[in-house]
Amino acid sequence: MPKLLDHINSPLELRKLSQDCLPQLAQELRDFIINIVATKEGHLGASLGVVELTIALHYVFNTPEDQLIWDVGHQAYGHKILTGRRNDFHTNRQIGGISGFPKRDESVYDAFGVGHASTSISAALGMAIASQLKGDTEKQHIAVIGDASIASGMAFEGLNHAGVTSANILIILNDNAIGIDPSVGALKQYLTNVKKGIQRKNNIIKALNIDYSGPIDGHDIDKVISELKRLKTVKGPKFLHVITTKGKGLKQAEENQVTYHAPGKFNAFTGDLILKTPSEFTKYQDVFGYTILELAKQNKHIVGITPAMPTGSSLKYMMDEMPERAFDVGIAEQHAITLAAGMATQGLIPFCNIYSTFLQRAYDQVIHDVALQKLPVIFCLDRAGLVGEDGATHHGVFDLSYLRCIPNLIIFAPRNEIELRNIMFTAQLGLQLPIAIRYPRGTGVTVDWKQPFSTIEIGKGVQLKEGINMAVLSIGTIAKNVGAAIANCNYPENVAHYDMRFVKPLDEALLHAILNKYETIITIEDNSVKGGFGSAVLEFASVNDYRNTVKVSGIPDVFIEHGSVNELQKTIGLDVESISELLNKLN
């Protein structure tokens, strides 16, 4: 049987198919996604779960004139394949290839760039209001949002506004009861009751003055198309509740939805994971997870908080053993931080684990609710620095810059697993101020990291290597590349290496000693060069009237796209070879 998918280069070809051909197309699209992701890796389960919905949306609506927004974008692979990127899909998330998320500059079909959760309703509403103002009353605006994302505050803000407008917006709830981890909270239970048919009255969407329909089976393509055609004729804000299964069509992905969200390589035929050679090193997230559990067993005041990332943060270890003291609050970063602040006022010791890129979503809470009140919340910022294939929306390269200007906040970047473990130990002993601890995705550098705890003196850096006429100052785990680069440069004996550890407070005594001894200083960080660690050193040198040459190296003032961490480091000059070349040039 000839493949239908081979002849679809845009939704124009899709709409020429008879409706009874669409189940075959759905199977082909699933197979295509599975076969590519099996070898190239990526987000699997979410895209498999919306194959029928994706086809139906492009079949019924006149995209790209009608505007379609995918919340987060994990589920948009089918959308990309049907909108002219089938032949490029094998480059997904690879350096120079297509993005794993919708991007406006990649395709006219990507109406809004996404990557973070809960933005789709507000964006679609903005577009719908703009169309109203232009007099384009027939244009359709569709936001597809998951049950985990819709529980976020921003999604509710969008719904609240939509309900008092006459804007032509359709909100589709893709309800599969899971985000990356299982959905949580009262809204999740409400949606479960709706699916069971025991929540007929007091519909929360209708109460917001939005036309509600559903729930319907999101894998019954005829039913989905029929309902979309009906809703196309309904004016004003509309809400369609669609029930789907994450991982649909691949048995293992349906049964193990957390693992198969982004499973890595697997056998496309059997679905079995292709296991990687086990690393002798431990992931930083697991160092955090094991350490907080160990500390919590010794200190009854410790609590753990994560906004929807119990697996990714490894807080799940504490949640499994101490569920009453570890909290997954859902996609609710603002709430997570102020919850931690409230706990801190009552003598608890909250470890709030948030990916660096997601802390951006709760900046006011860090300032207003924590730092201003000097509440000793312990922020553990996972995925700091370059994260790799998820690209610009997920790199954690701004935290040093946006946190450094906040009074009363300690900022620490561990060089290795032992340092991470010891700063967590030090923080729970009782700091008088909040602290942000940033560490990267991936594995560490120390096999035997589980050493007895020792305290770290706040605001003190360390010298790792002596040198004659040049000093490299690094912060965090980039010290590994720096150490190797010094060893490989032409005159390693000339180059000293310092791990400053704290961006705030800076070790001013050590900086005075360095600036008095070395004429040339190089700062190296995996944060933006604008306002980060290097900027702090430059400010210190200027305020104290030093005239040394200070070279700042880090993430350039551009958004870094996707690729492996090693590839991206090489592109921006943070790999070992590039740092060695810089040392040779300046030495």
Where are these regions (language model features)?
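Glycine-rich ThDP/TPP pyrophosphate-binding loop and its adjacent helix/strand module
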Residues: 110-281, 285-290, 409-518
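Cofactor-binding active-site loop characterized by glycine-rich and histidine/acidic residues
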Residues: 43-165, 284, 302, 307, ...
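Peripheral docking tails and interdomain loops at the edges
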Residues: 266-277, 388-390, 410, 535-587
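Active-site nucleophile and cofactor-binding loops and adjacent substrate-binding regions
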Residues: 41-50, 70-74, 102-123, 145-149, ...
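Non-catalytic terminal/interface segments that mediate subunit docking, oligomerization
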Residues: 67, 250-359, 365-375, 457, ...
